């Protein structure tokens, strides 16, 4: 911090205006951190709590096969609830893809659960954004999808990490929390 402060004051001087600008910038950074923490408090309240058994489900994949959560028992599974029409979901794809790249070779399974209702649009988004991890869907709106009801998904993107014992390790809307958890446990 001394280096940043030194550089800042070298550039902007040591006057009251410079000190005020520095304080405002610091406060904005703190607000951003607090706002991010508030996202879970606002949007992840109905997702399964850590330590509860993750509900099993079976959904259709893009290639027409079925995928069940129970297929991956004994592994960490990251459930990525999303949709192609969701701007926040699209914004998070690079971070989720980065998580996949960093942890899939360590045995972590990533599974996209889409709330798209149009298979062509869903598939186009998967191809356009080069999403590498398996995808599944009921092709129903979020409020109508059984998997959304099972997991209490009210907001997307939402992420649920299921531990090898089948219990929820983390439920969040903040992808960086998934990285922190996997980095700690894997």
Where are these regions (language model features)?
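Bacterial Sec-dependent N-terminal signal peptides
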Residues: 1-38
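N-proximal helix/coil linker or "cap" segments that precede and/or mark the start of modular domains
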Residues: 32-56, 70, 124-127
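A short beta-strand-turn-helix
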Residues: 57-77
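Conserved redox-active cysteine motifs that mediate thiol-disulfide chemistry
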Residues: 73-74, 81-98
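Active-site acidic short loop of glycosyltransferases
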Residues: 73-75, 105, 131, 153
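Structural microenvironment flanking redox-active thiols in thiol-disulfide oxidoreductases
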Residues: 91-129, 142-149
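Thiol/disulfide oxidoreductase modules built on the thioredoxin-like
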Residues: 129-131, 138-184
């Amino acid at each position: 911090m001394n280096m940043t402060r030194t550089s800042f004051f070298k550039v902007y001087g040591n006057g009251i205006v410079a000190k005020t600008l520095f304080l405002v910038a610091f406060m904005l950074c703190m607000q951003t951190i607090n706002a991010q923490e508030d996202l879970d408090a606002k949007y992840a309240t109905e997702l399964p709590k850590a330590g509860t058994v993750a509900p099993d489900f079976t959904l259709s994949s893009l290639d027409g096969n079925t995928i069940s959560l129970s297929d991956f028992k004994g592994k960490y599974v990251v459930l990525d609830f999303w949709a192609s029409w969701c701007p926040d979901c699209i914004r998070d794809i690079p971070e989720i893809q980065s998580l996949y790249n960093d942890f899939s070779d360590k045995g972590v399974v990533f599974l996209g659960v889409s709330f798209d209702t149009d298979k062509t649009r869903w598939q186009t988004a998967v191809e356009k954004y080069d999403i590498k991890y398996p995808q599944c869907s009921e092709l129903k709106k979020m409020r109508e999808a059984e998997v959304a009801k099972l997991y209490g998904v009210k907001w997307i993107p939402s992420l649920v990490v299921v531990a090898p014992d089948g219990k929820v390790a983390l439920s969040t809307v903040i992808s960086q929390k998934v990285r922190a958890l996997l980095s700690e446990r894997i």
